[in-house]
Regions:
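Bacterial carbohydrate/catabolite-sensing allosteric modules
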Residues: 1-181
Length: 181
């Protein structure tokens, strides 16, 4: 999966919707998180926005339950200028939405938010999340093809081919069009 492009697509979507102060929440201890951050930065820079490391929340596996929520909530309490949040995944997005709801922040009226993974979670709430889909059929097809090649005598060296799958933006109702304000 091209996670860099996924992070780019989400951030670019928010920019196109008129957002100018976009917080990024990314996982520091895995490749996907770093690639999604890279895409976020690329979209900001392409739009002429200054990258601000203070607008990025980095978390690790061991603090994923608390740090993303407490950090974004604290940014709101500190009156940090922000109008959108790009999240590492759907689960983190909904955790942050819960924390923001507790302090009276309404999604998407007050703040837009995106996820990543297009998980079942993204569609089980009244708020459907704008997210990135993993093309499951394509992944299954590629896995099957690799398995067939292996069964038919393909060498392990031949199997080390890297495939980059294109991410797909799934539009929900978690983002407000700020161009209409």
């Amino acid at each position: 999966m091209d996670d860099c492009k996924g992070g780019y697509l989400l951030t670019k979507y928010l920019i196109n919707m008129g957002h100018q102060h976009i917080v990024g929440v990314f996982k520091a201890d895995d490749h996907q998180g770093r690639e999604r951050h890279k895409g976020y930065v690329m979209a900001l820079q392409e739009a002429g926005y200054q990258y601000d490391p203070d607008m990025v929340v980095w978390f690790h596996t061991e603090d994923r339950q608390t740090k993303p929520v407490t950090s974004v909530v604290q940014m709101i309490k500190d009156q940090r200028k922000m109008d959108a949040v790009v999240c590492y995944n759907d689960q983190i997005a909904f955790s942050i939405i819960g924390g923001l709801h507790q302090i009276g922040v309404s999604i998407p009226e007050d703040l837009s938010i995106t996820g990543y993974d297009n998980s079942m979670l993204a569609h089980q709430h009244p708020l459907s999340l704008t997210t990135i889909a993993h093309p499951q059929e394509k992944l299954g097809e590629m896995a099957g093809q690799l398995l067939l090649e292996k069964i038919q005598g393909g060498s392990d060296k031949d199997m080390k081919t890297e495939y980059l799958i294109e991410p797909k933006l799934v539009i929900g109702n978690s983002c407000k069009n700020r161009n209409q304000e």
